[in-house]
Amino acid sequence: NGIERVEEDLMGKERPGIYDPYISVYCIEAGAKLLQREHFDIMYLTTTDFVQHKYAPGSVEANDFLSKIDYWLGELDKLGAIIGVTADHGMEAKTNADGTPKVRFIEDLLNQQCIPSRVILPITDPYVVHHGALGGYGTLYLEDQSQLTAAKAYLQGLDGIETVLTNDEAVTRFELPSDRIGDLVVLADASTTIGRTPSWHDLDKVKEGLRSHGGEYCQVVPMIFNKKLKQDYDDRLVSGTCRNFDLFHFLSNGF
């Protein structure tokens, strides 16, 4: 973005690591200091969800983190910025009664039924300390298309699996591109995650508890503004029909 020497000239301090809860605070603080230095028509500040993965709402750690985010949002407000805050997903605890991660390794389970498949987990990214590549959504490709009905019925009967959709059903229900999803789409319940095989995941990263997202229980997200919206936009906001990608439209036209 053409911004150089952030640590040396803008912030005067070292950037936190990716697994430091305060890397997100650093980002919002940097945005405020940039706006102090020069004018921008639009600023997009994106944070990590490390704290939300590791600490439940109301915990000391979560409250401390959010209070610091709130402070720097307040500094942006003082500078005259119109601020919109949203998220790409919610977050839920995904654990058994003993606190261990609750996982259904569906590729392994299907193999045990002589139904070979390849499971794709969209949550997979380099940041396995966050979530161990475990979330509530998975899609899979079958080696043998004639096993589609049997695979769907088997998965639907598993504890912790709430919904199993064919490609066509998932396209219609979730507005997904047909060529980017597999033969089946699998959604877990609120407290369960979907994995591939036990050997594919490093559960040591989440052995002290797992909070993650995916499925249909993490769809509701906040949309917060620091200025009063026009009445028609306010009506739309409280109607419950907005999507998080509507944020830019609201910021551009709603005041």
PLM features: what roles do these ranges have?
Residues 1-56, 136, 147-150, 156-163, ...:
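His/Asp/Glu-rich, glycine-adjacent segments
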Residues 1-9, 63-71, 102-122:
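Acidic, His- and aromatic-enriched active-site or binding-groove loops in soluble protein domains
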Residues 42-46, 84, 185, 224:
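Structural motif
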Residues 51-55, 92-95, 99-100, 194-196:
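Short catalytic/ligand-binding loop motif for oxyanion handling, primarily in non-cytosolic enzymes
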Residues 54-59, 234-236:
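Short acidic, glycine/proline-rich loop/turn micro-motifs
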Residues 64-108, 186:
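Metal-dependent active-site segment of extracytoplasmic phospho-/sulfohydrolases and closely related
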Residues 91-116, 125-141:
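A conserved active-site cap/scaffold subdomain adjacent to cofactor or substrate pockets
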Residues 123-255:
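Active-site neighborhoods of enzymes that stabilize oxyanions during catalysis
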